[in-house]
């Protein structure tokens, strides 16, 4: 109700203000003087604006009413009823039931530590060469017998040394032979990798074998290639020489390897 009354009151005030302003404007409009009309018109417009600003009232928002809740009545201390505590029941043990004996934990046995791995077998030590013992010379023997015994000792020493040398040569020759064979195969593979079949000879279905000799330097380089046996076709011979000249060193030349080598290069069509 209060809000509606306020809104009606504001509306009436605004209508009155607007009526006053309109009447004032009409009154000023009827005056004959143009200058006075212009001056009064300016004054009237300024007054009307001020009146409008003053008359427009902002309606205040209604304040919320504070609703006070009634405090709940606190219970009187005398009327509070305490809940009865449950009676404690005494547990009577049955004498016929024997208590179970507590199990005693046995101490854990320590696990035996793993023994260390056995060390590797000791390397066989090189056997020492057993020197032939000198036979004692009997002083009682005559001079002729002494000469015979001394010559026998010399022969024994010579035989042992010659046998040792022969064994060493056999062992050394075995290792040298394998190394030389491997080096020879490496040179052969290097030459074959650079072998190119001439196109013209291939079209004409020409085949043949070329024997070529060349020098092997200390660093393994190949040089001085020449044909020792022709294949019968000049293009095949030239292809064999080119393969050797283009080949690279496969390593230093091993001891005992010849400084010159001869190989046979085949050109065949399948």
Curated annotation (Swiss-Prot):
<feature type="compositionally biased region" description="Basic and acidic residues">
    <location>
        <begin position="82"/>
        <end position="113"/>
    </location>
</feature>
<dbReference type="Pfam" id="PF03544">
    <property type="entry name" value="TonB_C"/>
</dbReference>
<feature type="transmembrane region" description="Helical; Signal-anchor">
    <location>
        <begin position="8"/>
        <end position="27"/>
    </location>
</feature>
<keyword id="KW-1133">Transmembrane helix</keyword>
<feature type="repeat" description="3">
    <location>
        <begin position="74"/>
        <end position="75"/>
    </location>
</feature>
<dbReference type="GO" id="GO:0015891">
    <property type="term" value="P:siderophore transport"/>
</dbReference>
<dbReference type="InterPro" id="IPR003538">
    <property type="entry name" value="TonB"/>
</dbReference>
<keyword id="KW-0813">Transport</keyword>
<dbReference type="GO" id="GO:0015031">
    <property type="term" value="P:protein transport"/>
</dbReference>
<dbReference type="GO" id="GO:0030288">
    <property type="term" value="C:outer membrane-bounded periplasmic space"/>
</dbReference>
<dbReference type="GO" id="GO:0031992">
    <property type="term" value="F:energy transducer activity"/>
</dbReference>
<feature type="repeat" description="4">
    <location>
        <begin position="76"/>
        <end position="77"/>
    </location>
</feature>
<comment type="similarity">
    <text>Belongs to the TonB family.</text>
</comment>
<feature type="compositionally biased region" description="Basic residues">
    <location>
        <begin position="114"/>
        <end position="126"/>
    </location>
</feature>
<comment type="function">
    <text>Interacts with outer membrane receptor proteins that carry out high-affinity binding and energy dependent uptake into the periplasmic space of specific substrates. It could act to transduce energy from the cytoplasmic membrane to specific energy-requiring processes in the outer membrane, resulting in the release into the periplasm of ligands bound by these outer membrane proteins. Required for heme utilization and virulence.</text>
</comment>
<keyword id="KW-0653">Protein transport</keyword>
<keyword id="KW-0843">Virulence</keyword>
<keyword id="KW-0812">Transmembrane</keyword>
<dbReference type="GO" id="GO:0098797">
    <property type="term" value="C:plasma membrane protein complex"/>
</dbReference>
<feature type="region of interest" description="Disordered">
    <location>
        <begin position="56"/>
        <end position="178"/>
    </location>
</feature>
<feature type="topological domain" description="Periplasmic">
    <location>
        <begin position="28"/>
        <end position="270"/>
    </location>
</feature>
<dbReference type="InterPro" id="IPR037682">
    <property type="entry name" value="TonB_C"/>
</dbReference>
<feature type="compositionally biased region" description="Basic and acidic residues">
    <location>
        <begin position="127"/>
        <end position="146"/>
    </location>
</feature>
<keyword id="KW-0735">Signal-anchor</keyword>
<protein>
    <recommendedName>
        <fullName>Protein TonB</fullName>
    </recommendedName>
</protein>
<keyword id="KW-1003">Cell membrane</keyword>
<keyword id="KW-0997">Cell inner membrane</keyword>
<feature type="domain" description="TonB C-terminal">
    <location>
        <begin position="182"/>
        <end position="270"/>
    </location>
</feature>
<dbReference type="InterPro" id="IPR051045">
    <property type="entry name" value="TonB-dependent_transducer"/>
</dbReference>
<feature type="compositionally biased region" description="Low complexity">
    <location>
        <begin position="158"/>
        <end position="168"/>
    </location>
</feature>
<keyword id="KW-0472">Membrane</keyword>
<feature type="topological domain" description="Cytoplasmic">
    <location>
        <begin position="1"/>
        <end position="7"/>
    </location>
</feature>
<dbReference type="GO" id="GO:0055085">
    <property type="term" value="P:transmembrane transport"/>
</dbReference>
<dbReference type="InterPro" id="IPR006260">
    <property type="entry name" value="TonB/TolA_C"/>
</dbReference>
<feature type="compositionally biased region" description="Polar residues">
    <location>
        <begin position="169"/>
        <end position="178"/>
    </location>
</feature>
<feature type="region of interest" description="4 X 2 AA tandem repeats of E-P">
    <location>
        <begin position="70"/>
        <end position="77"/>
    </location>
</feature>
<keyword id="KW-0677">Repeat</keyword>
<feature type="repeat" description="1">
    <location>
        <begin position="70"/>
        <end position="71"/>
    </location>
</feature>
<feature type="repeat" description="2">
    <location>
        <begin position="72"/>
        <end position="73"/>
    </location>
</feature>
